[in-house]
Every structure is written in C-alpha cells, then in structure tokens.
Amino acid sequence: MSRLKINLDAIERDGASATEGFCADGVRIGSLLVSSEGVRDNQGNLCVLSLSDLEVVPETEGGFLGKGSSGSVRRAVHRGSNKVVALKEIKVTGQTHINEIRRELETLHAGDFATPYLVSFYGAFAHEGSVFIAMEAMDGSLHELYKPVPPPVLACITRLMLKGLTYLHRNRHLIHRDLKPSNVLYNSRTGDIKISDFGVSSNLECTKADAHSFVGTVTYMSPERLRGEHYSYGADIWSLGLVVAELAVGVCPYAGLRGGSSEARFWALLQHLNGDGTALELPPEMDSDLADFISACVVKSPDRRPTCTELLRHPFIVRYTGAAPEAEAKPFSTTTPTVLAPGGLSSLLNRASPAAGSALPLASEGGTPKATSPSPAPVSPLTLSCPLERHDGETDADIADRTVVARWIHAVMKRAVLHKARGHGREELHQEPLAAVSASVATDSGEGGGAAGVSAASLDNGQAAQHREFRAERNLDGHSGDGGSAPVEEDCTAGVRSLTCDDLRWTSTGEPSVNLDDELNRLLF
C-alpha cells in the first residue's frame, strides 16, 4: 500500500512558486495540493481527511480552544474513532498565510512520531477559503496553568520544553520564533509538555545561519529581534527564559509596561532592554538555581546565551530532575518519521480507538463546519497507579518528569474542585493549597536528589491515600463517596468526580487581562 510522504525539499524549493495559492482543486502549497479530500503530494499520494470525518464541538460546550498566530483552534471529534482532535483553521487571504501553512505542515509532519515533544499531526484539508489542520488535542497551555509553579515541578516542565527545542534546533534547524506560554501545551493525564504553533517558525540552512524577519509575539522577543537585527537559535532561548520566569513568578515578566499607549509601552520595553541594567529583576527569595537558569537565558548579548544542550546540564535541571547530563548530549534519532497511510487520520485514529460503536453522527456536507456534536465526555482523573506509557526514544528520566508534572496538575485540580465546592474564593485557593502541593511534589520528586528515580508505580500508595482523603473530605461536605466499589489501588478514580480543564482554568492566574502582545503587534504590523 502506498504511503504519503511529504517531500520537504520540494516544499522548500517550490515555496516561492507563482503557482501557489487557490486553484480549481483546492490550495496549492509548494509541492502539495490541499483539497477538500485531504493532502496530495506531487506523486499523487493522498492523505485522506475531510470535513465529513469530523464534528466540531460547539463553542458553548468548550469547543473553542484559542487562537494561533493567524487562525482559530477548535475542538473536534473524529467520528470514526470518537477521538478528540484540535482543528486549526487558517484563512488563506495571501502569500503570508500560504507561508504559514507550509511551515505548519512541514514542521508538524517532520516532527510527528520522531519526537514526543511536538504536537502530533493527523492531516489537513481545505474548505471555503480556509485550510484546516488536524492536530493532537491537549488539555490546555502553560498560559492557563496554575501559577506560580514550584521549582521541582517547573524543572520537569522546563526540561521537557528543552527537549522539544533541542529537536527543533538540532534536527530540524528551526527557530520557533513565537515561544510563549500559550504555545506550550500540556496533557494532565500523561504529563506531556509539547510545543505547538509553528506558523512563524523559520528554517536555517545551517547552524551558523541567522534570520532577520520580525514576526512573533513582541513581549517575548529577544533584544536583537526587537532591534531588527539578525538572530539565531538564541532568540528562542531568550523566550524560554521569559516563559520559565512567568511560570515561576506567576505574572508576565513585563506586565508593568501596561500603562500608557501601545507605542509608549513598546518604546519603554525597547529602552529597558537597550539599557545597561539586567533584562529581568527576579525576586530575591527565588530559588538560586532557578534564578541563575533564567538569568542565563535572558542575557542581552545573544552570543552569551547557552544552547539547549548546555541548559539541560544546568544545576537547576540536574538538581530537581536528576537527569544525567551526559545522556542529554546525545543527538535525537534521525530515523525517517512514520508517514500516514492513504487512510490518513481515519486509519491512524482507528488503531487507537477507545471503544467500538461510539461513532458520532455524520457531519453535514457542504457549508460551514457545523457545531452540532455533543461535547466529549470529561476525562477522568489521572490514574497514577498505572505506569505511564513510554514514548519512543524516552528515557526513565523523561517518564519521571512527566509523572511529576501529571501528579502536580492532578493535585491542584482536586484542590480547586474542593475549594470551589466549599464556596471558597480564588484568592484563598492561591494562599493555602499551593504550599502543601509544592511540598508534596518536592518530597516525591526527591528535591536535591533528583526525580529520575521516581516511577509511576512508586506513587501508588501516596496517590491512593490522596484519593481516600479527597473522598472523605467530599463526604464531610455532603458529597457522595465511592459507594464502596473496587479497591482504591485497583481503581483510584472510583467515586471521584471527573475533572475537566475548566476546573484547572478556574485556578489560573494567567497573563495580564490587557493583552500587551496583541496591542503591540497591531501597532507594529
């Protein structure tokens, strides 16, 4: 059976072709034709995916996930497998959008199955002037995550982000150019941390090349980019430092620039970064290794910033995650990524279908995507008594990191539900449970001794105790318990209300309500 293999060289070579754009059969992107039936390459191979394969979840039922660099992202359900996917729509109105779609398809397809640190790509199709890209659905972004994140957990999140950046820089020779909390996604059940939104990424022909275009989100841009100078991989390192700082402190690093007009705030930021002082003032009580890590990333001179490989050896990462520094220096596998069969999304998702006979109603043919599908059932809490599935190429340290992240998110979600049920305010939640959760995670992750020795199985007793305590607290509050069903160790989700992303978002500090990034981008572009 023939397989679709996207010719990345042909895409890059034909990128400036005059034939790109709308045609009778769809939208031509380099050597690819994106039609209503899916993606066809120049050899005639077709990766099948169409609107009729999907049902878009209504916005009133949590269907709207957010906006990318130039398109909206909605939740959809693949009717053949009942699996939830993220469906990104990019309205094609010019060459800029053609370029973005090319970058998305190239990066997602090349990274799919080659690394677990980028969101998976399922397929694409064209419909009524837009290109829709189906990707792996995640639970949320770091923008929505409870903040501040305790250092032991933050180190695990940061290490997983670094693994994704290492793949982009070393294997794909790509600068992401828009790394920010909303472009780093998490899965609360598995602890996966994945980089997304490659619409403004830039390819470097060799490791010494640099770029010069001005795209991305202004408040996470490095000084050399703000000045319009040439830049390289160090620009992503700067953005990473700001993301880590935001997770550590709980607010956008340059939130204080919200006063005045958009133009005044932009020039204030540029003046600050061009000054002689440090780029970022960190709280004196911050963990010393964490502060040193952030400071190393946000050095104003790009030549003095460390690489991803060097940061993976930083004391902040090694201390809390226990990952062997020499192991991180090994290059990623350069094997050819798995390619999709002609069945496309349908064949890929049906292999992992959670249940048979759960197909959804047919999507309507023609017209705009109909938001008529019922919202997918809430995902039950993470069951840490079962070891997390190992991704291809993962080490024990990777699994340990994901376990710590998943457990922390799960603990915060449970406390949020409990406080919400008791009628406590958001401020009370921020004052009390974080310290307890942080202490618990720090102990279990082996603060000072590394988290590499932490396995999912080793968390069984503690997790079971947490669920027993949580159920007891719910009973005291007049909520139903587990009904005395299966033992906790065998089913630690029994009797516990299903937790959804909304439970976690309720506790989110988030970025400032005034979106400085959007205002500055409107000013500049």
Curated annotation (Swiss-Prot):
InterPro entries: Kinase-like_dom_sf, Prot_kinase_dom, Protein_kinase_ATP_BS, Ser/Thr_kinase_AS. GO terms for molecular function: ATP binding; MAP kinase kinase activity; metal ion binding; protein serine kinase activity; protein serine/threonine kinase activator activity; protein serine/threonine kinase activity; protein tyrosine kinase activity. SUPFAM superfamilies: Protein kinase-like (PK-like). Its EC number is 2.7.12.2. Keywords: ATP-binding, Kinase, Magnesium, Metal-binding, Nucleotide-binding, Serine/threonine-protein kinase, Transferase, Tyrosine-protein kinase. The keyword Amino-acid biosynthesis does not apply. It comes from the Eukaryota. Residues 358-367 have a biased composition (Low complexity). Its cofactor is Mg(2+). It catalyses: L-tyrosyl-[protein] + ATP = O-phospho-L-tyrosyl-[protein] + ADP + H(+); L-seryl-[protein] + ATP = O-phospho-L-seryl-[protein] + ADP + H(+); L-threonyl-[protein] + ATP = O-phospho-L-threonyl-[protein] + ADP + H(+). ATP binds at residues 65-73, 88. This is Mitogen-activated protein kinase kinase 5. The gene is MKK5.
